[in-house]
From Swiss-Prot:
Positions contributing to NAD(+) binding: 31-35, 80-81, 112, 135, 172, 289, 313
Protein's name in the database: DNA ligase
Source organism (scientific name): Aliivibrio fischeri (strain MJ11)
Any one GO molecular-function label of the UniProt entry: DNA binding
Cofactor names: Mg(2+); Mn(2+)
Amino acid sequence: MSIEQTLDELKQQLNYHAYRYYVEDSPELPDAEYDRMMQELLSIESEHPELVTVDSPSQRVGGEALDGFTQIQHEIPMLSLDNAFSDEELEAFEKRMNDRLISKPVSLFCCEPKLDGLAVSLLYVNGKLVQAGTRGDGTTGENITENVRTIRCIPLTLQGEGWPTRLEVRGEVFMPKAGFEALNERALKRGEKPFANPRNAAAGSLRQLDSKITATRPLSFYAYSVGVIEGGELETSHYQRFVQLKSWGLPMCEETKQCYSLTEVKAYYKDILKRRDALKYEIDGVVIKVDDIALQEQLGFVARAPRWAIAYKFPAQEELTVLNDVEFQVGRTGAITPVAKLEPVFVGGVTVSNATLHNADEIARLGVHIGDTVIIRRAGDVIPQIVSVVEARRPTDSKAIVYPTHCPVCGSNLERVEGEAVTRCGAGLVCQAQRKEALKHFVSRKALDVDGLGDKVVEQLVDKEMVETPADLFKLSAGVLTVLERMGPKSAQNVVDALNKAKATTLPRFLYSLGIREVGEATAANLAAHFYTLEAIQVATFEQLIEVSDVGDIVAKHVLNFFAEPHNKTVIDDLQEMGIHWPEIKALDESVPQPLAGKVVVLTGTLHKLKRNEAKAALQELGAKVTGSVSKKTDILFAGEAAGSKLAKAEELGVEVMNEEQLIELLN
């Protein structure tokens, strides 16, 4: 199996399990297995940086917004943390930072337990809580303001004085152990299904569409950082910022502590690990941050995490259970994934009943049989893997796992390309399983974004043989849709309206919706920007394709193969006949100068005549690089009303400042 193929499979697996974990709150793997897969992906990408794509799980923070909530945009991305699993990895983290800082090594850390809950953002304007949101995918989250207002420890109005006019507080909503146990006891008495663990209970409670239900749940909150700060200043120490937040009525974890060396950090980790079971809440490690805010800003961020913080995870927890069966699932690209069906076992705070077996090679490596007693590990405390077989306990009636030769859904022959570990069904949309996944992808938020056409609706449409190709979706009428479960006339008409609305799209979205292997959002955008038209992409040669940013040999081959397939050409023609269209992309006139080419600019404050995202896009068209913070590298700060601390910092650094009127004049 080639490196590229290994990466491709890892991305598919990580994206699938991230969706199960972050969106459906129904993980199939222990954290340990997910972390292992992510570490493998990060290791390969570290050794082969040319293979890193914008759509890699390493470049994003997992989790999409649910359809039931309105969405919010995070002004400053809410990133996740990189993980360490040993003292050596912690020491490497410190070395990486000091190598970047050179002149001033890190000498003070702020440490706190890593709570196992749901990350949220609280926005206070003039001391009033005006908005609360989930982390979502890091840039877009769910608006859960009404639910958060029911959490009694979160102040609706800040106490004291001195808080900024706009202050974003970030933290973790969680359910204490005692509250979780009481909640499950009540559920059992009512004959209801109990929650598997406090994290799922917290997430499920916070994402209730009815805030009255949330109000009955024993939720709590600890602040762990700040985001937007405008119209005021905070302390320059991370720990002292906690003290400030506490003085304003925001709860902080009592175990938070400053450590003056890595030796003290290690001692703190061991102490928390020792006292873990005695704590009032579930944790899966400790978070270590550089305490000096100036050093944090100097160190900056990578794509998915800050360079100045790391989560030191606790060791994996293991349990014995029995492998009852193996199911073979079919993914969007035809990849066959064997899923172990386990005797449910409580390990690391989660009841585990499924685990991935990856592929035939992994099954052979483990030598696992149906009926075997196996060791399940949850590394990092949340996602499961079978690490070994207890052969001494193998029953006499155990059965060897027989890998299928035909697709378990459509019956087509399975193929395994030499050098690949993955077995695939090559039937494409003829295969019902692939058809379902392809259609789900086609209508997803980042593709054609068809509101109301969720996974369950798509599955019904395929099961009832109402659609075969994406173009068939646009032939559906409200009357036809009403035969589906839970689809009344109004909902059916809303779906038809959403489908009609989705016909007006963009070339990047359309390319992404086609589900070409390895072509994520960024690659689709790069292809569109390079070739301008779909026709040009369809006839592009291998040599032309690899000239596109982020397109290497493997992606180029996938694109060529996709457009060489007659069936795919037919699907595209049918979609265009159904009215799918997009605006023309105009080639950049290189004779027209870009006045902001190479300039680093920042937008801050309230704009009255422009929307912030429109202003950002317009500035980028003029060649500017738009960033979220002011530094010595900033060339221009565009300041709206109540610009706050960014304006003060720009003036201190001598950065050019323009108001909204000057911004509009420049854009015109």
